[in-house]
C-alpha cells in the first residue's frame, strides 16, 4: 500500500495547480516548468551513447554521470559562473599507499568592480576567473547577465540584476538615461532587438516561488481595494435613495 496519494517527486508540480500558485501569471509558470540542464563546468560529457574500445575494438556503452556540486549560500550573492564546491578524497602526503583523506575543492574568488551600461552603476561583485572569461566572451557585463539562462547564472543576485535591467529597458522613457536623450537612444537600440519584453513580464523575472506568491497576494489585495473604492459611491447612492429596501435585503441575508 503506498504511503502517499501522489508520489513525492510530483508534489512541487501539483502545488502549482492549486491555491494562489495557480493564479500566478502564465509566463512565470512557464519559466518554472522549463527544465534545462546547466552547462557542465566541473566535468566533460561524452556527448555520445557508445564508444569504441581502443584495445578490443568493440562498441561499449558510456553514460554521462555529473559530479555532485555543492553551492554555498555565498554563491547566491555573487557571480561564480556555475562553479561550486566539490567534495572528494586525496592521498595523505601524496603517497598512494597511505590512507585517503577527505578534501573539498573550492573555486578561487575575486572581488571586482563591474559596470552596467543599462543601470549606469558600478557593482562590487565576488566573481571567479570563469565568470570574467564568460563576460569577455560575450563582450560586456550586461550581455552576460541578459544572455545567460537562469540555470547557468545560478545566482539570486544575478537574476535580480537581470530583472532590473529588463525593467529599465521596458521603462526607457522615464528610467533609461532621462537626462541624456542621445545616450538613451544609443543604449536602447543596442539591446532592443533581443532583450526588450513587456514591463508586466519583466517584473516577474528572477522571483522565487515565495516572492512571486507574495507579489500575487499584494496585487489581488490592491485590486479588491480599488474595486471597493469604485463601488462605494454607488452603494452610498443606493442606501440614500432606497434605505428600506436595503434593510430588507440585509435581513433576508441574515436569515
Regions found by a protein language model. Give the residues of each.
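Compact, Lys/Arg-rich rRNA/RNP-binding cores from ribosome-related proteins
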Residues: 2-255
Amino acid at each position: 500500500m503506498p504511503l502517499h496519494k501522489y508520489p513525492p517527486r510530483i508534489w512541487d508540480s501539483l502545488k502549482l495547480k492549486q491555491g494562489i500558485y495557480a493564479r500566478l501569471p502564465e509566463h512565470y509558470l512557464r519559466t518554472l516548468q522549463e527544465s534545462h540542464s546547466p552547462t557542465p563546468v566541473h566535468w566533460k560529457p561524452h556527448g555520445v551513447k557508445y564508444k569504441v574500445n581502443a584495445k578490443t575494438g568493440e562498441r561499449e556503452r558510456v553514460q554521462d554521470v555529473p559530479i555532485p556540486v555543492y553551492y554555498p549560500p555565498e554563491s547566491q550573492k555573487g557571480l561564480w559562473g556555475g562553479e561550486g564546491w566539490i567534495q572528494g578524497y586525496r592521498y595523505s602526503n601524496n603517497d598512494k599507499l597511505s590512507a585517503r583523506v577527505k578534501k573539498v575543492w573550492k573555486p578561487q574568488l575575486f572581488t571586482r568592480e563591474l559596470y552596467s551600461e543599462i543601470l549606469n552603476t558600478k557593482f562590487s561583485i565576488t566573481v571567479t576567473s570563469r565568470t570574467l572569461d564568460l563576460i569577455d566572451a560575450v563582450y560586456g557585463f550586461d550581455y552576460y547577465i541578459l544572455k545567460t539562462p537562469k540555470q547557468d547564472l545560478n545566482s539570486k543576485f544575478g537574476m535580480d540584476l537581470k530583472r532590473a535591467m529588463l525593467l529599465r529597458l521596458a521603462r526607457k522613457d522615464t528610467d533609461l538615461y532621462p537626462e541624456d536623450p542621445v545616450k538613451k537612444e544609443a543604449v536602447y537600440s543596442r539591446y532592443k532587438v533581443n532583450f526588450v519584453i513587456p514591463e508586466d513580464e519583466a517584473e516577474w523575472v528572477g522571483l522565487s516561488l515565495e516572492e512571486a506568491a507574495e507579489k500575487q497576494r499584494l496585487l489581488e489585495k490592491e485590486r479588491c481595494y480599488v474595486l471597493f473604492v469604485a463601488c462605494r459611491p454607488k452603494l452610498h447612492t443606493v442606501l440614500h435613495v432606497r434605505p428600506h429596501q436595503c434593510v430588507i435585503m440585509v435581513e433576508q441575508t441574515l436569515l
